[in-house]
Amino acid sequence: MIKDIIKNAEEKMQKTVTVLKSELGTMKAGRANPSMLDKIQIDYYGSMCPLSQAANISSPEPRVLMITPWEKQLLKEIEKAILKSDLGLNPSNDGSIIRLVIPELTEETRKDLVKKVKKTGEESKVAIRSIRRDANDKIKALKKDGDLSEDQVKKGEDDVQKKTDAIIKEIDKIIVDKEKEILAI
């Protein structure tokens, strides 16, 4: 029972880390990265679908993304979706592909981006702590029901804390790495 609670908490914590990595991947750091476009949805014959499912996205140069749609008639729709997004990129449509040139980041933009990264990291840590609290509450509930002894509860809470500490350490490393990437000129 207690192992299931800990395993469940660990899975939720790992999902939180995966979401963090995904969110940080969409933040532009002066380099072209196809994951920057992950959140862009296009109107594909009346239904919304991710850009990556309607086009090939590649990075032929460090600061250029090239979008090759599966169907040429999607060019205008893709261009419109990129302009509507909060990425601040200007697509260049040549009739068969769309090029996105990622502008150099100014010092001020870099600092703002670092603040965003730290805020996102902090939100992830809060989510991790919430998962820890839920797991500990479930363990304590088992004690109230008489299913666990005080020692088992203490060991369970210690195990949850160890998992929490490891995940928070991983988040800190991810944040520091992203900050270095942003601040590298």
Swiss-Prot record:
CDD domains, per database record: RRF (cd00520)
Upper classification of the organism: Bacteria, Bacillati, Bacillota, Clostridia, Eubacteriales
Record-stated family: Belongs to the RRF family.
InterPro entries noted in UniProt: Ribosome_recyc_fac, Ribosome_recyc_fac_dom, RRF_sf
Cystines in this chain: none
Protein task: Responsible for the release of ribosomes from messenger RNA at the termination of protein biosynthesis. May increase the efficiency of translation by recycling ribosomes from one round of translation to another.
Protein's GO biological process: translational termination
Organism: Clostridium botulinum (strain Alaska E43 / Type E3)
GO molecular-function terms, A-Z: ribosomal large subunit binding
Entries under HAMAP family matching the protein: RRF
Keywords: Cytoplasm, Protein biosynthesis
The protein's name in its UniProt record: Ribosome-recycling factor
Cellular compartments per GO CC: cytoplasm
Compartment list: Cytoplasm
